[in-house]
Every structure is written in C-alpha cells, then in structure tokens.
Regions:
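Single conserved hydrophobic/aromatic residue that forms the stacking wall/gate
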Residues: 2, 184-191
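Short, glycine/charged-enriched hinge/interface segments at domain edges or termini
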Residues: 3-72, 90
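A generic structural signal for well-ordered coil/turn residues at beta-strand boundaries
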Residues: 19, 27-30, 125, 133-135, ...
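Generic structural hydrophobic/aromatic packing signal, biased to beta-strands
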Residues: 51, 139, 163, 185-186
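Secondary-structure junction/capping motif
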Residues: 54, 111-112, 190
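Short glycine/threonine-rich loop/turn motifs
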Residues: 58, 66-180
Length: 191
C-alpha cells in the first residue's frame, strides 16, 4: 500500500495475509449535508413548483467514493435561519468535520447561509467565484477548529460543478492525495 492511497479490499487482503494488524491511516472525515429551500422535496410525485432533492443523493454518492461518513441533515426551509444557526453551534462541538449545504448561498432574501456563517470565527472565507455554472459558492474554516463549511449553489448542475472543482480537491487534500492535473485543449467547431 502506497502513501496517499485509499485502502481497498485487495489491500486488506494483502495486509491480513502478511499478518500486518496495524497501519497508520488518516481519520475518516464525517460530512454533514443540508439541502435548503421551501421548494425542495423528497417526495416521488411533486407539483410543478417543487424540486426533487437530487443534490443530497449526488453529494452522498461522491462522498462515498472516498469512503467518508455521510450524514444527511435534511432540508432547511427558507425561514430556518435560526434552526441553521443552532445546528452550526451544536456541530462545532461534535465529530462533524465538514458541513456542506446546497442552496441559500447567493444574495437573495432567503439566502441565509452566508449571514449565519459570518457570525462565527472564520478563516479562508470566500463567497463567489467567477465560473458558470457555479458562481455562488461559499467556503470557510472555523478558526481553532478542524472544521470546514462549503455552501454550494442549489441548482443541481452548478452544485455538481462546485463540488467537483472546490469540494473534491479539498477532500483529496485531507487524504494527502495529489490533485489531478488537467490537460487544456482548444475546441473547434466542425459541423
């Protein structure tokens, strides 16, 4: 097993075969996810104005790729600012390492995540990047705690893009995995 590798079943087989009982590994992070918005639902049959809670399933599946512990915090409604603030205070003293929210991070009336996050002692804070899809994204670390918060956009494609380009590299860095380098290609139209 090499450094910066995620242990798989074949590694376990080799270690047990060789009689190796203890190896040094990184702690498995605990990730708590919240969806936000009055329009978000987990129901099968939905009215036209509702949106299926697809972001939680997407984030859960991506987090499970790392074998991290995923906890679904449920759906926070548009007026759940105080509920969210109380949950954050409680989380600060829990085993949760990373909080990820989906929605409520832009500049609208019900976009409460940035307002609540500002109330805490933060470092490495940003709230917007120049990419589309995915412009409204929040990242913060709580000073004195090993906890990070990502506020992703509510739009599923924007949320997936921000997860891929911001959360995913952060998770890799927690494990000590080197970031993937990308090849840049110029595309040409051919019709």
């Amino acid at each position: 097993v090499y450094k910066r590798q995620i242990l798989q079943s074949n590694h376990i087989l080799a270690l047990k075969t060789l009689g190796i009982k203890n190896i040094k590994v990184k702690k498995i992070p605990n990730i708590l996810f919240f969806s936000t918005g009055k329009e978000i639902t987990n129901q099968e049959n939905i009215p036209n104005w509702k949106v299926r809670n697809s972001n939680s399933y997407y984030i859960k599946s991506k987090v499970k790729n790392f074998l991290f512990n995923f906890f679904d915090g449920g759906i926070l409604r548009d007026r759940d600012e105080l509920v969210f603030e109380k949950k954050i205070k409680k989380i600060l003293h829990s085993k949760i390492d990373i909080i990820i929210t989906s929605g409520a991070v832009s500049a609208g009336k019900f976009d409460f995540v940035p307002r609540i996050i500002k109330k805490f002692n933060l470092s490495n804070h940003f709230k917007s990047v120049a990419i589309r899809p995915g412009k409204p994204i929040l990242f913060a670390k709580i000073k004195g705690k090993q906890k990070a918060i990502f506020g992703l956009p509510g739009n599923p494609i924007s949320s997936a893009a921000c997860f891929r380009f911001f959360v995913y590299p952060y998770l890799e860095s927690l494990l000590g995995i080197e970031a993937v380098s990308y090849t840049h290609l110029r595309a040409h139209e051919t019709y």
